């Protein structure tokens, strides 16, 4: 049986520095974080962007892990080259194959701490259920968005993204660092419990399923001509109902939520998403029954069956 190995990534975006700082301190003091004896690799996702103090150099690294893009190194694209390196080093067929990838991020939006799952892979949903049961974190299921693909964790058999905010880009914050450490240790603890078959899965999983993203108001030339309404700013995870305020213009015009069905907004006014023409994303809160297939998939993965 292969040794269980977990890839821990911080700095997938070079200006999200709290996880990077935590990893650097961890290297100095190996006892700082309890991995419960599980072999881990702590990796800075985008070291070149970190040096430059930028989110990325040529292309968003967390959109660079697309199927078929690892065939050859592209010297003209730092992030696609780095994506290939990470898969070659730590992917299923890599030099140090990891079964699970955990990618630690921060956000400028008032998201608090949450877990992001891409698609509906059984092992992902099982691990997300465990961490939600332990810490009560919301789970954002990102799917059905063809404009946003190629996420890092999708290149591993099981993978979750941890998002913590709000925090400005390039800033250290004690709360963010403490939350990152807590979630990392809890994830490792739960993986350890699965490894030892000493685990308790919840009966339900609360999901915030991605519906769509919306852009800022724009004028005829494509320039942003409105901003997030004061009643919507910093109200991530709070239900939107028809006619609630979304945006405001300087002339006093208010743009309202027009959907008949209530949605839950997330990543409201995230600074890094402006270039992606995203002002916020809408989700639908759903209560899912925990499936035995999820549990078995995670157990089989960790025990290499």
Swiss-Prot record:
Listed cofactors: Zn(2+)
One Gene Ontology term of the molecular function aspect: hydrolase activity, acting on ester bonds
Reactions the enzyme catalyzes: an N-acyl-L-aspartate + H2O = a carboxylate + L-aspartate
Residues that bind substrate: 55, 62-63, 163, 273
EC number: 3.5.1.15
Keywords (A to Z) from UniProt: Hydrolase, Metal-binding, Zinc
A cellular component term, taken from the record's GO annotations: cytosol
Binding site for Zn(2+): 13, 16, 105
Cofactor detail note: Binds 1 zinc ion per subunit.
Entry-linked InterPro entries: AspA/AstE_fam (IPR050178), Aspartoacylase (IPR016708), AstE_AspA_cat (IPR055438), Aste_AspA_hybrid_dom (IPR007036)
Family: Belongs to the AspA/AstE family. Aspartoacylase subfamily.
UniProt xrefs under NCBIfam families: PRK02259.1 (NF002601)
Xref: PANTHER family: ASPARTOACYLASE, SUCCINYLGLUTAMATE DESUCCINYLASE
The protein, known as: Probable aspartoacylase
Source organism: Prochlorococcus marinus (strain NATL1A)
